[in-house]
Amino acid sequence: MLEIVYQDEYFVAVNKPAGMLVHRSWLDKHETQFVMQTLRDQIGQHVFPLHRLDRPTSGVLVFALSSEVASQVMPMFAGQEMSKTYHAIVRGWIEEEGELDYALKVELDKIADKFASQEKEAQDAITLYKPLAKVEVPYSTSKFPTTRYGLMELKPKTGRKHQLRRHMAHLRHPIVGDTTHGDGKHNKLFREEFDAPRLLLHASELRFVHPYTQQEVVIRAEVDKVWQQLFERFEWPSTLLTASH
């Protein structure tokens, strides 16, 4: 059963579990569980994805309840009219909030994009970032006896593929658990010492003006047990995830 965090006659939103694909893909033929099909069976009607979340990312994922709504609303979700808030645990400490304006080249998939042009220009990509908490753990990943990590609030202003993961890696503060853009030493430490074997990136909140009622919609999704036990270990108050809204 998926946790439904919002529903009206036009939309339904779930708290996507980490590791679950949004829909069937020929690249992952062995997979049997998908958010789209599970949700369809759960509510008894077809659903139409309005945006994407990478497979390892958890959090708010919104679907339209008809193809007509999907086609009308999709441009809004693709544009700047959505306010998205993510939380991530990253390597090292970032002391001040800021804005990263750093263009990203289109990431091509080795299989799916085999025949796509390799020469596409970089696309504008902007992310707002804000440090919320920090911790120093008594484990070494380098010449120092301890290692530092930080909790970040991230707000993408554009929607490029793997934007937050790539932007944090560009800042030399990769998201813990990122096997593509991250640092294997830190991923291993979290896997072995903190029982956190995956990407620590969560889509906490989505805000938009409802296109049919003109009311502001705020959809929030709680973090799962992996995050909760990390907050306990690091002595971070859970209110950090809602205080900045």
Swiss-Prot record:
**Catalyzed reactions:** uridine(65) in tRNA = pseudouridine(65) in tRNA
Q: What pairs make up the disulfide bonds?
A: none
Q: What is the superkingdom listed in this entry's lineage?
A: Bacteria
What keywords would UniProt list here?
A: Isomerase, tRNA processing
According to the UniProt record, what class of enzyme is this?
isomerase
What the entry lists under InterPro entries is as follows: PsdUridine_synth_cat_dom_sf, PsdUridine_synth_RluA-like_CS, PsdUridine_synth_RsuA/RluA, RluA_PseudoU_synthase
What GO terms in the biological process aspect are recorded for it? enzyme-directed rRNA pseudouridine synthesis; tRNA processing
Q: What is its EC number?
A: 5.4.99.26
The UniProt entry, under Pfam families, shows: PseudoU_synth_2 (PF00849)
The protein's matches in SUPFAM superfamilies, at most eight in alphabetical order, are given as: Pseudouridine synthase (SSF55120)
Q: Where is the active site?
A: 54
Any GO MF annotation of the entry:
RNA binding
The role this protein plays is: Responsible for synthesis of pseudouridine from uracil-65 in transfer RNAs.
Q: Which family does the entry's similarity section mention?
A: Belongs to the pseudouridine synthase RluA family.
* Protein name (record): tRNA pseudouridine synthase C
**What is the scientific name of the source organism?**
Vibrio vulnificus (strain CMCP6)
